Each structure stands twice: as C-alpha cells, then as structure tokens.
C-alpha cells in the first residue's frame, strides 16, 4: 500500500524566527497523525537548520526547494546534496513551475537534478504540469507525457515522488476538478510503469478540498503552497479524513 506524502512548499516565505514559531504551533497539531502518511515541509534554505535543530523533528521530514547535480563547484545560488544531507534533509523539489517559468529550466536539467538527488540518497519530488493554454488546446496529456519521459529518464521509481501541478491552478484559487486530476495522475503512473510510485496533486490545495482530493484512487498526497504557511490550515490538510 502506498503511503501518502503531504508536503508543504514555503517558497520564499518565513525567517528562521518565524519558522521556529510555526513549528512550535504546528507540531502539537500533528502528534497523533495517522501512520499511513508522512508530512514534509520545504522551507527556504536559511530556515532548514531551524527544522533540523527542533527537538520534535521526528514528526515531519525536511525537503529542499531545489538541488544541483554536482556536489560542489562554481554554481552561484545553487545548493548541493551533501550540504542538504548535513542538515537532515530527505527530499528535494525539482522542476517546479516557477523555476521552469522564471529561469527557463528544461526537462533535461530537471532530469539531472532528479537523478543526482537519488544517487545522493535524497528523494526527488519532481513537478509536472500544463499551462491553461495547453489545457484548452487539449494538449495536457502530451505535455505531461513529455515532461515525465524526459524529466524522469533513468530515475528509480521506488525512490521518487511525482507532483502533478497544473500551472493554471497554482496560487490562483482555481482547483483542478478531483476527477480530472486523478486521470492525469493515473496517466503518470502508467507512463512510469510502477504501481507503487507516489503521485501528488498540487494547485490551490486547501482544508476545504483536501478530503475530496485524497479520496481519489491515484492521488497519494499533495504538494501545498500558500495553505502550508498557516500551521492550523496545514495541520488540517495533514490530518485529512
């Protein structure tokens, strides 16, 4: 049985002091969480040490928001696996729509990040998703197929999370219908060819829609943006019914 992964991506939010206050409020809210799921938070790099130093760290895992495909070198603004592992990081988000959009990150680069994350002992959370224009033209399946085939080449599906994030639903308040999201997640699973691969949905996930999302057969978790910044909101999501 696949274990659900409920992940929060803080993006460029939270100082170390704010992260500490958040954890003090959040951790008691998930102490009795069911054992069929994991909770993961991806704080900014500066706040990762706040997580690893927290006394109740066992209640959740840490993810980075990016990772490079080299252990060291002249790669300004990047971060390497060994730097992250030193702080207890277990996961790394790669291929999020924001670096794809703002920094023109390619499927080839995303693949290099994912492969190196796995070889370094981290689990990559690889994001895929179509734009509104691509969806309206009926190209969603083709776009997702390309991103999966190119972005996941030579990865190990037993140590992998794929997050389906329709770009038009990220931070917009628009949510992909649960059945539609489930169809795409089913497609991703078939493309990968491994039934136990964990597939998340991301895109305006909130406390009022989490139960329906998690009732879908091919959705194994969520990647949450804005709603993960509020400890009560994210705790409700983590404790979905």
Curated annotation (Swiss-Prot):
It is found in: Cytoplasm. It comes from the Bacteria. InterPro entries: Aldolase_TIM, TIM_sf, TrioseP_Isoase_bac/euk, Triosephosphate_isomerase, Triosephosphate_isomerase_AS. Its EC number is 5.3.1.1. Pathway: Carbohydrate biosynthesis; gluconeogenesis; Carbohydrate degradation; glycolysis; D-glyceraldehyde 3-phosphate from glycerone phosphate: step 1/1. One of its GO terms (biological process) is gluconeogenesis. Keywords: Cytoplasm, Gluconeogenesis, Glycolysis, Isomerase. It is an enzyme of class 5 (isomerase). It catalyses: D-glyceraldehyde 3-phosphate = dihydroxyacetone phosphate. The active site is at residues 96, 165. GO terms for cellular component: cytosol. One of its GO terms (molecular function) is triose-phosphate isomerase activity. It holds the Pfam family TIM. Disulfide bonds: none annotated. The keyword Cytoplasm applies. Substrate binds at residues 9-11, 171, 204, 225-226. Homodimer. Belongs to the triosephosphate isomerase family. Involved in the gluconeogenesis. Catalyzes stereospecifically the conversion of dihydroxyacetone phosphate (DHAP) to D-glyceraldehyde-3-phosphate (G3P). This is Triosephosphate isomerase. It comes from Prochlorococcus marinus (strain MIT 9301). The gene is tpiA.
